Amino acid sequence: MITNFFSVLTPFTFTSAISFNFPSFSSLEPNISFENAYANEDKVIQITGSKLTPWYHGRATYFRPMHLWDKGSKNLTDFATHFSFVIDSQNLSNYADGVAFFLAPNGSKIYRASNGSDLGLYNPALNSTENSFFAVEFDIWSNYQLDPPREHVGIDINSIISVANVSWLSNITIMEGNLNEAWINYNSSSQNLSVIFTGFKNNVTVNQSVLYCWFEKGPTWMG
């Protein structure tokens, strides 16, 4: 479940910057596109299954596309986002794959035939250039040959095999359905992508991080 969302996207001129803040959600919100997802009675976005609808995946995207990079100048866009979310296994040891923040080409749709490991983004029938997306995955299920053998946070670029990942101290938060937070920042000048997120160690919430130098160009407009 996504509980709140704040994002600032700063392209090449200040006047074209995009900023939005959602302290709560409604399924009637015109600025969010829901695919197999909805805002529940707690005013949070439900994007995976519940006891009534297991093995379910969905996603929610902001309606306005982001100018990710300029072909003429070769400039990339700075962006920063902060959101909070809950993954609740409902005290079950066999649970789903997790949740991801993503950027995908404008107009892209959820891949409905995907397995949980595909994040609703990756289509195994396509090649690496056709699978165009960026994602930060909060992965709680280890898929053989795709993931490290542990809960982890990974950075994905056009593939569900992460280019960088770090162990996520998340087991207690998953079993108890506790709140998690994440901050994702990209500085186009330094090409540094920073992901800071909360974990849980010795009954105390701790901050963890994963970094990556991202310079690859992709589609001009992302959503």
Residue ranges of predicted features:
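Polar, low-complexity loop segments and adjacent catalytic/binding residues used for recognizing
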Residues: 1-223
